[in-house]
Amino acid sequence: MSTPFWQSKTLQEMTEQEWESLCDGCGKCCLHKLMDEETDEVFYTNVACSWLNSKTCSCKDYPNRFSSGENCLKLTQDKIAEFHWLPRTCAYRRLSENQPLPEWHPLITGCKSAMHAAGQSIRNRVVYEIDVKDWEDHVIENPDY
């Protein structure tokens, strides 16, 4: 049995298809984060981009997400050093820090339902940016991700 690509290749060596398959579809990267200007500490909120579908945990306009969502960032292999803002459970961040994929990851389980069952997605746990006045009121204390 061959070694899975995420264990045998660096992030830079992955094909576009392999790179895209690392995304577990949890939707956490679509939540707004706040950064302390003095310490650069990242604070996660439960405030979602208006383009995020909170039931499917995916973008409502995925093909056009980088032009539709003004704050949508494309994760690319040349930005690996910047992945510190991603959730600790994110495959891109974990592999960039030489950590294994979590046991519920779809590449390991073969389905996304294990991720949802483990409580690792944003499914039905968010508010939308259009409904929020003060994002600091929505900081998640001790996020599980």
Curated annotation (Swiss-Prot):
Enumerate the Pfam families for this protein: CxxCxxCC (PF03692)
Question: Do you know which InterPro entries this protein is assigned to?
Answer: Puta_zinc/iron-chelating_dom (IPR005358), UCP006173 (IPR008228)
Q: Which residues form a coiled coil?
A: none
- Domain of life assignment: Bacteria
Give the residue spans that cross the bilayer: none
Xref: PANTHER family: UPF0260 PROTEIN YCGN
Family from the record: Belongs to the UPF0260 family.
UniProt xrefs under HAMAP family: UPF0260
Q: What is this protein called?
A: UPF0260 protein VV1_2014
Q: Which organism is it from?
A: Vibrio vulnificus (strain CMCP6)
